C-alpha cells in the first residue's frame, strides 16, 4: 500500500492529530488538533516530513510527480469548504504555503502568502471584495514574497536594503508619503509592474502566472529552505537532526488587510520573557501576519494592561495612547473576548504556554497556528512551577518541561547598580529578552561573527533583524533594533537563544552605509561601546560592568524538586574559595576536582615552584617545597572551610613541569638571580624539561613517582590544613586523588607515600582525620584493569577530558584544525570533548565501574571532566550507575536538573 504523504484538515475534521508532530511537523499537527477541538482554522493540508527527505533523496521532479494527484485532490477539498476556486478569475481561492518542522524553528524557513494571484485574478479579487486596494496590496505582497523565497531576489551587497523595499521607498518618495498604507491603488499597481521587471532583470525569469506552477514552486522552495544556511545553523544550535525534515502546510488564505474590521496578530498565553501568567501579544489593523513577525511595522498591544505598559516605556501619555494606539481589548472588544477564551482553551488543552498566530477577516477570528512557545530560562522555570501550583501539570512534568541548558540564562549577569547610576541613558525600547549586555557596535551579522572570533564582545545593531542575521545574533552579546515589537523576529529568536535584546527602539536612526547609529543627537559609530538592558529596555552609552544575577524563589523550588527525584549527586570543579562558594550556593554537595596546580601561579608561589622544578638535587627540591608547603596549606584550609562537612577531592600535581618554568630570557634571568645560578644553567634545565608529546609525557603520577617529595609535600598540605580545621571545630572531608595512572603499581607507590606521610603528620598534630585515597581513571589501560586498581583505590573519578583524548587519539589542543570538517561531513555528530562519546569512552567507563565494584562493592565512582555539566553526558552517567558528576560551578544547576530528568526517564 502506497504510504500517505498528504493529510487534510478543515471544518472541524482532520486526518492528523497532536501526537503526529514527527510526521506532520509541529504546525501541521497543531492545525489538525485545533480543528478537532473546535478552534476556527482555515482549511488546508499538510505534506509530511517524510516527503522532505524523499525530496533530497529523489529530487524535485520525482517528488512533484509523487505528490501531484494528492495535492490537486486536497486543493479541491479546500475549494469546496471555502466555496471558491484556485486560479479562478471571478471567485479566486488564495493559499499560504508555510514550513513546519517537528521542533519550532521561528523564522528559519520560508513562508509565502496570497499564492494564486496573477494579473487577471487580482481584478477578480478586487471585484469580489469590492476592495481594489486590498486586492492589489495582496498581489504586491505575493510578488515580493515569491520573488524573494522562490526566485531568489536578495540584496546584492550587505549594505543594500531588500530590492523590493528599495522600490517601495522610491515610489513613496516620488509620491511624497512616509508610510506604506498611504500608497493608493495606482501606486500598488506600479509596484507590481516594477517588482516583476526587477525579477526579470536580476533572475532572468518571468514571474509565473499559472496558479499550480506557483504552488509547486512554493512547495519546493519550502523543502529547499530546510537546507538553507540559517536553518542549518539553527539546527546545530538547538541540536535538531537534519533527517527530521520539514513538513509543508498549504492553507486557505484569510485576510487581515481587508480594512478597519480586519487585523492580524501574534499572542502568548503567558509572558515569554518573564513567565508572568498574563495573556499578551501584538496586533496590526489592516495588515498581514508577516508584518507583525518581520518587525516591519511596530504593532499595538492586544490587552489594555499590555498597552499601558508599552505606552509607559515609550513615554506616551494615556490620552495619546487611547487615541492613537488603543489595545485590541479596547478597539475590538468582541474579537478580544473570543481570542482570550480560545487562548485559555488552547493552553488548558496543551498544558503548556502557547504562541498563537491569528487573523481577523472582516470581523471573523481565525487561528493560523499554535505551538508551545519559546521562552527565556527565567520564564521556563516560572511557568513550570506556576503550572505545577495551578494543578495543570505534575512534578515530573514540571521537571521534564525545563531544558537543562536554559538554566544557564538565569545565571546571566546584570549591570552593576553603582555603575548604572552613573551611566548615560540614550533611549528606551521594548524589553524583548532579559539580561544585560555591553559590547562594541556592529551593524552586520557577518561582522558580528568575525569580531566575536577575534575576541571582541559585540552588540548587533539593526533596523530590524531577519533570519539571515542568525549567525551574527548568536555571536553577539545582545541585539538592539529600531523596529519590531515583542513578537518580532529579533525578540523571538533572542529569547530562544537566551540573548539580551531591546527591540523597537524608535528613537534610533541606523545608517548602514556610514555604519553609524544616531540616538537623540548622539552619533555612535561601528566599534563604539554600547550597553543594553533587555529586562527594562534601556540603552546606555559606553561600557557598564556587570555583576551576578540573583536567583528567584521559583529557581530554588525547582532545584529542591530536582533533588527529590535525582539519584546522581552533583559536585563541582573548584580551585579557589570563591569558586567553591559559588558552587555551594548552586547546590553542589562537594568538590569532585580541586586542581592543585592552579594554586602555584601567584607571583610568590611561582618563584618557589620554579626553584623546586629547576633544583639540581633532592635537597634543593625539598628546600623549595618547604617554601611551598605553607602556601598550599593555606589554600586548602580556605577551600575546606568553605566546603565544611562536604567531601573535597584534591588531585595531586598533574601538568608537565615545563608549563611552570620561564621560557623567555627575562624570566630566566630573574630565576637565575633568585636561585643564585647562571642563566645558562636555567636555560639548559628548561630545555631538558621540554617534551615532544607532553600530554603523554612526564606528568601526573609519573611526576609523583619520580619526585616522591612532591607528593609528600602536597599530602602534608592537604591533611595539615584538615587537622588545623578539625582543631578549630570544622568538619573537613579530604580525598586525595592520584592522577593519570595506567598500572596498579603506579598507584601503589603513590598510595604508600601518602599513607606514610599521613601517619607521621597525625602523630605530630595529635589528631587523626579520616581521608580517602582514590585515583583518576583517564588512561584506557586503567579502565581495562579497573578490578586490580580497585583492590587499592577507595574511589574512581573518571577524567573524561584525557580519557576522550587517549581513546580517540585526538589532541584536545589540536582538534580544532579538523573538527569543523568532521562535523560538516558527519564523520562526527558532535564534538567528543563537549558531549561524552557513549559508544567508546562510555563503554570504558561502564566496564571500569563494573570491574571496580566486582572487587570493592561500595566503590564510589564519579566523573570530573567538563562532560559533568553536559545534560546528555549526565544522563549517561546516571544510566551506568555513577554516584556523582562534577562540573564547573555555574553548570551545577544544569547537572542537577539533568540528573533528575535521567531518573524520571528511567
Give the ranges of each region predicted by the language model.
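Nucleotide/phosphate-binding sheet-loop regions of phosphoryl- and nucleotidyl-transfer enzymes
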Residues: 1-423, 431, 450, 456-459, ...
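Extended, non-globular alpha-helical segments
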Residues: 428-468, 519-557
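Short beta->alpha connector loops at strand-helix junctions that form conserved
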Residues: 45, 482-484, 503-506, 594, ...
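Glycine-rich phosphate/ribose-binding loops and adjacent secondary-structure elements
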Residues: 364-366, 459, 466-474, 486-493, ...
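A short, small-residue-rich loop immediately preceding and capping a beta-strand
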Residues: 477-483, 501, 862
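Conserved alpha/beta-domain cores
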Residues: 98-99, 551-554, 561-906
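Short mixed-charge
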Residues: 76-88, 517-520, 759-768
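Structural motif
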Residues: 249, 442, 459-461, 480, ...
Amino acid at each position: 500500500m502506497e504510504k500517505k504523504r498528504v493529510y487534510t484538515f478543515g471544518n472541524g475534521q482532520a486526518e492528523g492529530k497532536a501526537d503526529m508532530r514527527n510526521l506532520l511537523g509541529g504546525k501541521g499537527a497543531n492545525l489538525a488538533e485545533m480543528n478537532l477541538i473546535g478552534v476556527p482554522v482555515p482549511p488546508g493540508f499538510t505534506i509530511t516530513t517524510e516527503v522532505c527527505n524523499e525530496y533530497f533523496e529523489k529530487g524535485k521532479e520525482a517528488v512533484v510527480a509523487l505528490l501531484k494527484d494528492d495535492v490537486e485532490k486536497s486543493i479541491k477539498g479546500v475549494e469546496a469548504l471555502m466555496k471558491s476556486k484556485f486560479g479562478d478569475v471571478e471567485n479566486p481561492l488564495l493559499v499560504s504555503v508555510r514550513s513546519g518542522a517537528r521542533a519550532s524553528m521561528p523564522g528559519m524557513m520560508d513562508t509565502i502568502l496570497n499564492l494564486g494571484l496573477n494579473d487577471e485574478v487580482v481584478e477578480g479579487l478586487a471585484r469580489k471584495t469590492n476592495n481594489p486596494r486590498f486586492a492589489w496590496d495582496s498581489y504586491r505582497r505575493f510578488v515580493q514574497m515569491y520573488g524573494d523565497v522562490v526566485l531568489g531576489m536578495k540584496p546584492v551587497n550587505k549594505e543594500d536594503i531588500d530590492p523590493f523595499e528599495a522600490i517601495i521607498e522610491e515610489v513613496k518618495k516620488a509620491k511624497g508619503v512616509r508610510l506604506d498604507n498611504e500608497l493608493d491603488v495606482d501606486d500598488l499597481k506600479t509596484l507590481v509592474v516594477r517588482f516583476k521587471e526587477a525579477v526579470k532583470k536580476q533572475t532572468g525569469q518571468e514571474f509565473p502566472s499559472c496558479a499550480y506552477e506557483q504552488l509547486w514552486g512554493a512547495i519546493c522552495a519550502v523543502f529547499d529552505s530546510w537546507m538553507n544556511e540559517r536553518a542549518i545553523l539553527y539546527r546545530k544550535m538547538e541540536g535538531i537532526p537534519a533527517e527530521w525534515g520539514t513538513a509543508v502546510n498549504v492553507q486557505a488564505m484569510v485576510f487581515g488587510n481587508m480594512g478597519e474590521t480586519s487585523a492580524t496578530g501574534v499572542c502568548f498565553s503567558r509572558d515569554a520573557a518573564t513567565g508572568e501568567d498574563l495573556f499578551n501579544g501584538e496586533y496590526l489593523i489592516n495588515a498581514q501576519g508577516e508584518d507583525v513577525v518581520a518587525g516591519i511595522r511596530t504593532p499595538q498591544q492586544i490587552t489594555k494592561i499590555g498597552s499601558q505598559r508599552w505606552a509607559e516605556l515609550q513615554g506616551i501619555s494615556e490620552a495619546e495612547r487611547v487615541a492613537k494606539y488603543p489595545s485590541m481589548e479596547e478597539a475590538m472588544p468582541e474579537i478580544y473576548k473570543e481570542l482570550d477564551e480560545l487562548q485559555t482553551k488552547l493552553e488548558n488543552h496543551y498544558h503548556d504556554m502557547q504562541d498563537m498566530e491569528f487573523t481577523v477577516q472582516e470581523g471573523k477570528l481565525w487561528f493560523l497556528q499554535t505551538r508551545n512557545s519559546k521562552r527565556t530560562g527565567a520564564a521556563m522555570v516560572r511557568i513550570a512551577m506556576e503550572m505545577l501550583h495551578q494543578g495543570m501539570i505534575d512534578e515530573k512534568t514540571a521537571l521534564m518541561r525545563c531544558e537543562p541548558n536554559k538554566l544557564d540564562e538565569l545565571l546571566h549577569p546584570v549591570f552593576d547598580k553603582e555603575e548604572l547610576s552613573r551611566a548615560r541613558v540614550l533611549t528606551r525600547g521594548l524589553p524583548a529578552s532579559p539580561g544585560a549586555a555591553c559590547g562594541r557596535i556592529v551593524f552586520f551579522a557577518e561582522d558580528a561573527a568575525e569580531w566575536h572570533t577575534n575576541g571582541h564582545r559585540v552588540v548587533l545593531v539593526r533596523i530590524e533583524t531577519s533570519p539571515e542575521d542568525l549567525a551574527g545574533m548568536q555571536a553577539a552579546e545582545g541585539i538592539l533594533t529600531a523596529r519590531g515589537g515583542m513578537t518580532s523576529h529579533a525578540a523571538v529568536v533572542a529569547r530562544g537563544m537566551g540573548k539580551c535584546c531591546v527591540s523597537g527602539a524608535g528613537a534610533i536612526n541606523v545608517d548602514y552605509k556610514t555604519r553609524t547609529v544616531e540616538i537623540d543627537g548622539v552619533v555612535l559609530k561601528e566599534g563604539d561601546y554600547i550597553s543594553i538592558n533587555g529586562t527594562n529596555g534601556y540603552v546606555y552609552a559606553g561600557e557598564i560592568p556587570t555583576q551576578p544575577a540573583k536567583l528567584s524563589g521559583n529557581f530554588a523550588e525547582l532545584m529542591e524538586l530536582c533533588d527529590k527525584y535525582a539519584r546522581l549527586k552533583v559536585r563541582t570543579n573548584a580551585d579557589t574559595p570563591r569558586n567553591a562558594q559559588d558552587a555551594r550556593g548552586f547546590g553542589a554537595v562537594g568538590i569532585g576536582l580541586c586542581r592543585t596546580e592552579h594554586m602555584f601561579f601567584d607571583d610568590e608561589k611561582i618563584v618557589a615552584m620554579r626553584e623546586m622544578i629547576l633544583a639540581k638535587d633532592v635537597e634543593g627540591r625539598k628546600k623549595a617545597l618547604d617554601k611551598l608547603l605553607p602556601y598550599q596549606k593555606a589554600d586548602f584550609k580556605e577551600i575546606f572551610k568553605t566546603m565544611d562537612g562536604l567531601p573535597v577531592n584534591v588531585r595531586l600535581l598533574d601538568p608537565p613541569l615545563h608549563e611552570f618554568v620561564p621560557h623567555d630570557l627575562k624570566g630566566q634571568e630573574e630565576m637565575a638571580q633568585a636561585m643564585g645560578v647562571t642563566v645558562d644553567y636555567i636555560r639548559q634545565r628548561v630545555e631538558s624539561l621540554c617534551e615532544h608529546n607532553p600530554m603523554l609525557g612526564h606528568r601526573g603520577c609519573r611526576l609523583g613517582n619520580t619526585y616522591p617529595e612532591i607528593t609528600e609535600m602536597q599530602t602534608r598540605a592537604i591533611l595539615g590544613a584538615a587537622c588545623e580545621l578539625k582543631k578549630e571545630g570544622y568538619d573537613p572531608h579530604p580525598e586525595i586523588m592520584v592522577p593519570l595512572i595506567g598500572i596498579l603499581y603506579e598507584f601503589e607507590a603513590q598510595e604508600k607515600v601518602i599513607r606514610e606521610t599521613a601517619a607521621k603528620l597525625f602523630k605530630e598534630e595529635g589528631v587523626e582525620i579520616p581521608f580517602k585515597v582514590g585515583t583518576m581513571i583517564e588512561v584506557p589501560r586503567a579502565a581495562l584493569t579497573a578490578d586490580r586498581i580497585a583492590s587499592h583505590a577507595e574511589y574512581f573519578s573518571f577524567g573524561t577530558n584525557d580519557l576522550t583524548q587517549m581513546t580517540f587519539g585526538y589532541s584536545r589542543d589540536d582538534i580544532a584544525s579538523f573538527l569543523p570538517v568532521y562535523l560538516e561531513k558527519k564523520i562526527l555528530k558532535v564534538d567528543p570533548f563537549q558531549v561524552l562519546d557513549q559508544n567508546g569512552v562510555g563503554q570504558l567507563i561502564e566496564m571500569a565501574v563494573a570491574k571496580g565494584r566486582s572487587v570493592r562493592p561500595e566503590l564510589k565512582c564519579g566523573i570530573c571532566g567538563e562532560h559533568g555539566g553536559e545534560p546528555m553526558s549526565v544522563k549517561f552517567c546516571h544510566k551506568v550507575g555513577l554516584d556523582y558528576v562534577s562540573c564547573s560551578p555555574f553548570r551545577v544547576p544544569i547537572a542537577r536538573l539533568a540528573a533528575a530528568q535521567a531518573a524520571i526517564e528511567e
